[in-house]
Amino acid sequence: MLNKIKEIKKEMGDDLLILAHHYQNDQIVSVADYVGDSLKLAQMAEKNKTAKYIVFCGVHFMAETADILTEDWQKVLLPALTAGCPMANMADLDQAEKAWELLKAEFGDEETVPVTY
């Protein structure tokens, strides 16, 4: 499988960017263009203006963040669709909405931007 990935990377050149979260196994890391935490990888995705396809070897929220930050013509792909993060799933919708209401009541509606994990 690694040889096939390397072959595809060679064929696609700058049209392909592979990002791997630092917890990925050594084989995935060996074919990644960048390895790091979710913030660093999102920044690398945003800075890249040549790749048509960005493969994000991480979990849903990481790929979603990269997709928000990249250009409309760039496609962010998550190779393992079942990849999830227990921390990202800790708060349910009711809890998130309650927290949002508390923040709005304390700081106002217009200047509050919650940043979540």
Predicted segment positions?
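Active-site loop-to-helix "anion-binding N-cap" substructures in soluble metabolic enzymes
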Residues: 1-117
